[in-house]
């Protein structure tokens, strides 16, 4: 045995030290030297030629046509000097003041018209017109319309005075205009009662009549406007009510559809769950079928242990892998062993999972035995 060990060690050393030029056993020092030689022995002429080419290209790039480059630089500078600078444009252009001037002209025209109306304020009727125009809501008074109708007579100075009093009551604050109207009415009692007062009264009556007409027209317009607004309000209210009804109906219908959709979804979900339950039941049946032992195997094992079987579980038919075990049912506990049948037994599949451990124990034991034998022989 000692000779065998020496032979094995010597053979291993010989294989490692034997220099073979085939395969992977190559002299490492020789390979390193070859690599160094191939790395150091570089062609110096090729490197020198490359350096010469590089220096020549650099000199050519730097020294070629310096005059042309200077001329190009001068041309660029001259172009920069000659190019005129663009004036900055004001992008914020203001609109022409034509509309403002027109607005001022319109305002001036209105002021001029008002000044002419002020000059005519001595007539007495202009005061009533101005008061009625200022107080648009007062234009619907029936008393003023009657005063204007009375002013159409022309000869009745007292009616004109009453119209002036009505104008005074409408204006309230214009006492001066009322005084002028009273003076005009009093002038009818003097020497001008025949000519100037009658002409003034006629003019006032004419002014009063259009005022009455204007007044009535304004009242009618106001009534029509109010009626139109009321009608529009009624139509709007009716439209809103109809829209509300339609909206409510639409919401109710949407709610019904939603409820129906939810009910259908619930039914489908319930059906799906029922189907899942069926699938689970089928899977359970399949598992039970997989767990059910073979009838032939049960019968054979019953014939072996018929005399010893009881209400306790019998040992498994195998020591490694899947097998069968059985016991008597409670109803067949008092039966004789010869009368037992497969229907009198409860059977199930048994599995033995410790097979690997057994094999490990066996292999380890065999290894120990071999080692002991070797030790004894040595």
Swiss-Prot record:
During host cell invasion, proteolytically cleaved at the cell membrane in the region I by a papain-like cysteine protease of parasite origin. Cleavage is triggered by the sporozoite contact with highly sulfated heparan sulfate proteoglycans (HSPGs) present on the host hepatocyte cell surface. Cleavage exposes the TSP type-1 (TSR) domain and is required for productive invasion of host hepatocytes but not for adhesion to the host cell membrane. Cleavage is dispensable for sporozoite development in the oocyst, motility and for traversal of host and vector cells. A lipid is attached at residue 355 (GPI-anchor amidated cysteine). Residues 66-92, 101-126, 141-162 have a biased composition (Basic and acidic residues). PROSITE patterns: TSP1. Residues 304-356 form the TSP type-1 domain. It comes from the Eukaryota. Sequence repeats lie at residues 99-104, 105-110, 111-116, 117-122, 123-128, 129-134, 135-140, 141-146, 147-152, 153-158, 159-164, 165-170, 171-176, 177-182, 183-188, 189-194, 195-200, 201-206, 212-222, 223-233, 234-244, 245-255, 256-266, 267-277. SUPFAM superfamilies: TSP-1 type 1 repeat (SSF82895). Residues 91-95 are annotated as: Region I. One of its GO terms (cellular component) is cell surface. Keywords: Cell membrane, Cytoplasm, Disulfide bond, Glycoprotein, GPI-anchor, Lipoprotein, Malaria, Membrane, Repeat, Signal, Sporozoite. Residues 214-283 have a biased composition (Gly residues). It is a lipid-anchor; GPI-anchor. The N-terminus is involved in the initial binding to heparan sulfate proteoglycans (HSPGs) on the surface of host hepatocytes. The N-terminus masks the TSP type-1 (TSR) domain which maintains the sporozoites in a migratory state, enabling them to complete their journey to the salivary gland in the mosquito vector and then to the host liver. The unmasking of the TSP type-1 (TSR) domain when the sporozoite interacts with the host hepatocyte also protects sporozoites from host antibodies. The TSP type-1 (TSR) domain is required for sporozoite development and invasion. CSP has two conformational states, an adhesive conformation in which the TSP type-1 (TSR) domain is exposed and a nonadhesive conformation in which the TSR is masked by the N-terminus. TSR-exposed conformation occurs during sporozoite development in the oocyst in the mosquito vector and during host hepatocyte invasion. TSR-masked conformation occurs during sporozoite migration through the hemolymph to salivary glands in the mosquito vector and in the host dermis. This is Circumsporozoite protein. It comes from Plasmodium cynomolgi (strain London). The gene is CSP.
């Amino acid at each position: 045995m000692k000779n065998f060990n020496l032979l094995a060690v010597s053979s291993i050393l010989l294989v490692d030290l034997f220099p073979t030029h085939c395969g992977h056993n190559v002299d490492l020092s020789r390979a390193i030297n070859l690599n160094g030689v191939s790395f150091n022995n570089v062609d110096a002429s090729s490197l020198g030629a490359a350096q010469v080419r590089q220096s020549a290209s650099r000199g050519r790039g730097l020294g070629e046509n310096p005059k042309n480059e200077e001329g190009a630089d001068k041309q660029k500078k001259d172009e920069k000097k000659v190019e005129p600078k663009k004036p900055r444009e004001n992008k914020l252009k203001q609109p022409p003041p034509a509309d403002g001037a027109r607005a001022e002209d319109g305002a001036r025209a209105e002021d001029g018209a008002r000044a002419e109306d002020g000059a005519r304020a001595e007539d007495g009727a202009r005061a009533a017109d101005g008061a009625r125009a200022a107080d648009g809501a007062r234009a619907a008074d029936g008393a003023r319309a009657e005063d204007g109708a009375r002013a159409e007579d022309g000869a009745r100075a007292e009616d004109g005075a009453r119209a002036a009093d009505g104008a005074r009551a409408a204006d309230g604050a214009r006492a001066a205009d009322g005084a002028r109207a009273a003076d005009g009415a009093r002038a009818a009692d003097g020497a001008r009662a025949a000519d100037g007062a009658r002409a003034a009264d006629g003019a006032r009556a004419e002014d009063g009549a259009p005022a009455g007409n204007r007044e009535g027209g304004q009242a009618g317009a106001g009534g029509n406007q109010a009626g139109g607004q009321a009608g529009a309000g009624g139509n709007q209210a009716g439209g809103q009510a109809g829209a509300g009804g339609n909206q409510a109906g639409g919401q109710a219908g949407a709610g019904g559809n939603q409820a129906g959709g939810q009910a259908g979804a619930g039914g489908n979900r319930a059906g799906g769950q029922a189907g899942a339950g069926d699938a689970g039941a089928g899977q359970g049946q399949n598992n039970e079928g997989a767990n059910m032992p073979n009838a032939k195997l049960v019968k054979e094992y019953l014939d072996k242990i018929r005399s010893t079987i009881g209400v306790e579980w019998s040992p498994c038919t195998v020591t490694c892998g899947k097998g069968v075990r059985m016991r008597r049912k409670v109803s067949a506990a008092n039966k004789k062993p010869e009368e037992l049948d497969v229907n009198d037994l409860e059977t199930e599949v048994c599995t033995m999972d410790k097979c690997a451990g057994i094999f490990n124990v066996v292999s380890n034991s065999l290894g120990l035995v071999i080692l002991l034998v070797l030790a004894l022989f040595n």
